[in-house]
Amino acid sequence: MSVEEWKQQKSAVDFSQDSVKKSTALDILHSVFGYQSFRKGQLEVIEATLAKKDSLVIMATGGGKSLCYQIPALCFSGLTLVISPLISLMKDQVDQLLANGINADYLNSSQTFEQQQLVQNKAMSGKLKLLYISPEKALTTSFFHFISHCKVSFIAVDETHCISQWGHDFRPEYTQLGGLKASFPDAPIMALTATADQATRQDILIHLKLSNPHIYIGSFDRPNIRYSLVEKFKPMEQLSQFIAKQKGKNGIIYCNSRNKVERIAESLRQKGISAEAYHAGMSNEQREFVQRAFQHDNVQIVVATIAFGMGINKSNVRFVAHFDLPRSIEAYYQETGRAGRDDLPAEAVLFYEPADYAWLQKVLLEKPDIPQRQIELHKLQSIGEFAESQICRRLVLLNYFGEYQQKPCNNCDICLDPPKKYDGLVDAQKVMSAIYRVGQRFGAMYIIAVLRGSQNQKIKEYQHDKLSVFGIGKDRSREYWQSVIRQLIHLGLIKQVIDHFNITLQLTLEALPILRGEQPLQLATPRISSIANAVTIPKRAVTNYDKDLFARLRFLRKKIADKENIPPYIVFNDATLQEMAQYQPTTEQEMIQINGVGDIKLKRFAQPFLALIKEHQIFRTTKK
């Protein structure tokens, strides 16, 4: 049954009008999408759109942004255009809409001329409710000629942070979308994004020429994601230990270079872990293969550059690890937002080394001194402060976006394992003395080698084994001294100087009172072990479900998805399966009460799941 057939059955509701009541939106939410209630902010945004108002919607990833425009699209009588930046994201959204019986399609460069003509014919004949297009396509003369033959009721512009030079993912073609307002003066425009600070919001309003818009700024908080930072000591070993703890869960590892992506993916494969590389240097066919394998649960982990980002709508990504420092908090937030989109517990882990920050800073400082450089330096400084923070990471993250909270989250490494302070004056003096004695011409690892009394050849050649500081820190590990040096850098007592490919440590003027012992210094006890173990369970998460039944339901879902040639989460996501495993419905009347089961999916997919649940119950009864 399609949505159009479903509409005909709902004869009491007049879908021919471009104005519908709140009850209609709620009815669509229940019957088409299978959810029992709206999330915070969704209904007010939908009602504003149905009242023909433009809107700006800033809502966290996983917060239900898509429903904000998909439900009005079903209420309006004409076509809804959705501007989306990535081909993969378009296809994924369309697949999910089709699974719910909604007539949707896309136009992009991956299609042949004949395929595009077929889609255009469907749109012009009124057979489509939603049409996804790229911003580049939306600006072409041929597109405007075609779309002039369609009744466009509504326009949604997704990922609108791309419109702003302040945004972390600037796309120049987005800035030209303001022409949509003139071309479709009667169609309300909705701009959507998960990440936009004040400057970015202003750019969106100006460039899209939104008229007296309804502005909804939701919470940026993702309470089901635990944020942790790992100080890099033996990075590959630490990453391998973290992956081992995931026990086969799906995840994404982000790196800043293609070479590193390839090396890490190969290293994981050698350990028997299902992992694939993804970066811009691969062919389109290779990238599509990896993305498809990941979405279909045929690959556990994707190791990627930022090229692998917005196109991922997979709901059961359980962790995102950043092996390198991102360039901004917006980028970090957007990328970690790929985890836990089903509202179940997920992890975001940042592997951090101050040298990563120094290299990124050097790259930016070598750019021409233009406003864009200052913007990027400001954003880099903010992510550096996030990494070095000694207070709740979630508070730092939310404060950056102007959402001020006072209560710690109890779901980050700082809250779960608060830093312990100690009198670090002597340790600081040892490090600073070593830096000074070797002429302020060497990097952190060399300073540590001197402190620990290493017998390496380079130290002997420079006769630094004869210095008074040689070996005065041999009672502490290399990792311990790395942590001390990082803190001294963060405190501004020593600085990293980059010259070509070398990073040297030098003292700042602020170091002199410490060297002389004229003022005290508190340092955090080095956190040699890394990732905190506790996980806060979000309010919507199901906890007392039958684990054996859940595993069987997941196996059945994969079997059905492979047969239908769609990703498993499009059948039902993990949160829906967990509800099934808890409440164990055995009739269609019971199944329709499960979140994520709408009329279309009930008829298309429910019977095998109902049969499996009945079989499981009989087996359990017989076993008892």
Predicted regions located by residue number:
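Flexible coil/turn residues that form the inter-helical turn or adjacent wing/linker of helix-turn-helix
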Residues: 185, 247, 390, 440, ...
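Helicase motor core with emphasis on the C-terminal RecA-like subdomain
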Residues: 19, 23-32, 36-40, 44-56, ...
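Accessory DNA-binding and partner-docking regions appended to nucleic-acid-acting proteins
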Residues: 1-25, 376-377, 406-624
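C-terminal accessory regions
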Residues: 379-404, 549, 555, 562-564
